[in-house]
Amino acid sequence: MLSRTILFSTSFLWVRVANAAFGITTSDDSYVIDAGSANPLKFTVSRSSCDITSINYYGSELQYSGTGSHIGSGLGSADVSAVEDGDYIKVTCDTDTLTQYFVVHNGDSVIHMATYTTEEPSVGELRFIARLNSELLPNEEPFGDVSTTSGGEAIEGSDVFLVDGETRSKFYSSQRFIDDQRHCVAGDAHRVCMILNQYETSSGGPFFRDINSNNGGSYNSLYWYMNSGHVQTEDRRQGLHGPYSMYFSRSGTPSTDIDTSFFANLDIKGYVATDGRGTVSGTASGADSSFKWVVHWYNADAQYWTYTSSDGSFTSPAMKPGDYTMVYYQGEYKVAETSVSVTVGSSTSKDISGSVETGDTIFKIGDWDGTPTGFRNAENQLRMHPSDSRMSSWGPLTYTVGSSELTDFPMAAFKGVNDPVTIKFTATSAQTGAATLRIGTTLSFAGGRPQATINDYEGSAPSAPTNLNSRGVTRGAYRGLGEVYDVNIPSGTIVEGENTITISVISGSSGDEFLAPNFIFDCVELFQ
C-alpha cells in the first residue's frame, strides 16, 4: 500500500511538472500561453479581439465563460501576434490608437501587462477588467463585501445597490493611488491580485481613487483603472500605462515588489528604462508634523509621488526627464508648490517648504488636511451610501464650539437635506473686530458651495466651483479640487458673548436628497 501511495504521489507530481511546458500553442482562433510555472498557468488570447477567453490555473478555470477579460469593454478587433523570446512570451494587440501587451516570464504564474495609447478611448476612460469565476473567486480584498453587489436592488443609477440591508457599490472598493499597490479577488483555493507599481501615465494624482473590484454575481471583476471621469481633476495622459501585473497564487498574498525591468528588452512602445530617467531628492519642511507629508510631481505627460520620511527627507521614484510642477501636501492639503527639472541619469536637489497660514484663531473645526476625517459619517462614507442605515443622522446639526464633539459636525452639507449647518461660539470683546471665516471644502457636486451668515450679516454668495460632472459623495469619493472660501466679516459683526454662524448650500441646480447640490467639508476656521 505504501509503495502504491508513493507511486501515485510521484506520478501526480510528474503530471504537474509535465504540464508546465513554457511556450505558445497557436490555432486559427487563439494563442494559448503556458507560463511553465510550478503551479500551472495557461491562458488563451483571441487572435481577433485580444480578449483573454480562458485562464486555467492549477487545474481550475478562473475565467468567466460569458465574456472575456480585456481593455475597456473589449477592443472589438485588433491585430494580435505572439512571440517567444528566450524566457519571455509577448502577446501584442494593435489598434489604430492603442496597443495592449501581455508578457509572461518562464516559470512565473503572472501575466504582466502594459497599455500604450495615443488618444483617449471614446468612452472617456481607460481600464483593464479581468472577469473572473465568482464561484471559485467570490471574495474581494482588502475591503471585503462593500463592493459585492450580487443579488442587490439598484437604489442610485446602475451602480449603487441595496444588499441585505446594506448599501454597496463597485466604487466602494477604491483606494488612494498612493496606497494602492495591490488589490485582489480570492477563494478557498485561489487568489488573483492586481499588482500596481507604476501610475506615471494615469491621471488624478496621489489621492485619486477608482474602482478596484466588483462581485456582481455572474463574475467577479478585478480592475485597473488607468484613468476615468470618476471625479477626475486633470486631463488624461497618453503613452505607456504600466507595467501592471495579474498575479496568481493558491493562498498567500503576493508581495508588491515585482521586478518588471525586463520590459526594457521586449520592444514595448513608450517604455523608459531606469537608465533613461532621473530623480529628485530634498527635504520638505514647515507643515504640521502630526500629518503624513506627501511630495507630488506632475506635468502633461507623467505624475509621481512619495511619502517623506519622518524628518521630511524624500527621494522621488525614477522619473522621465522633463519639467515638473512639484507640490507639498500636509495630509492631502497643498501647502507649497514649486517647479523642478529632471534630467537623465542625475538626481536633482530640491527642497520645499510651506505651512497652513491663517491668523489668530477664534475657533477651528476639523483640520487642514484636505479630507473630512473626523466629521460625522466620514469614517463610513468611503464604503457606503449616505442613505445607509449604519450612517448617523445627517441633521441639520448644531455644533457648539468648546462643548461639541467633532462628530457633531457633518462631513458634507446637502441642499435641503441637512443645511444649514449651525455653529455657535462665544467671543470675547477683543474678538469683535474684523475677521475671516474660512470654509475649506474637498469636493462639490452640482454646483454646491457654502454661503455663510454670521449673526445678522450675510456673507456674499461665492461663484460656482468647477463642475467635475461626476457623482462623488454617494460613490465613496471625497476629493475634488479642494475649493476654499473666505468670508470677510466686518468689524462689529461678531459680538461679545454668544454668536451664531449658519452655513447653507447654494446652487442654481437641484436634485433629490443626496443627489442634491452638496459639498464636503475639510475645515472651518474663524480667525483675525
From Swiss-Prot:
Its EC number is 4.2.2.23. GO terms for biological process: cell wall organization; pectin catabolic process. It is an enzyme of class 4 (lyase). Pfam families: CBM-like, fn3_3, RhgB_N. Its main location: secreted. InterPro entries: Carb-bd-like_fold (IPR013784), Gal_mutarotase_sf_dom (IPR011013), Galactose-bd-like_sf (IPR008979), GH-type_carb-bd (IPR014718), RG-lyase_II (IPR029413), RG-lyase_III (IPR029411), Rhamnogalacturonase_B (IPR016590), RhgB_N (IPR015364). Disulfide bonds join 50-93, 184-193. Residues 1-20 form the signal peptide. Keywords: Carbohydrate metabolism, Cell wall biogenesis/degradation, Disulfide bond, Lyase, Polysaccharide degradation, Secreted, Signal. It comes from the Eukaryota. It is found in: Secreted. It catalyses: Endotype eliminative cleavage of L-alpha-rhamnopyranosyl-(1->4)-alpha-D-galactopyranosyluronic acid bonds of rhamnogalacturonan I domains in ramified hairy regions of pectin leaving L-rhamnopyranose at the reducing end and 4-deoxy-4,5-unsaturated D-galactopyranosyluronic acid at the non-reducing end. Pectinolytic enzymes consist of four classes of enzymes: pectin lyase, polygalacturonase, pectin methylesterase and rhamnogalacturonase. Degrades the rhamnogalacturonan I (RG-I) backbone of pectin. Belongs to the polysaccharide lyase 4 family. PANTHER family: RHAMNOGALACTURONATE LYASE-RELATED. This is Probable rhamnogalacturonate lyase A. It comes from Aspergillus oryzae (strain ATCC 42149 / RIB 40) (Yellow koji mold).
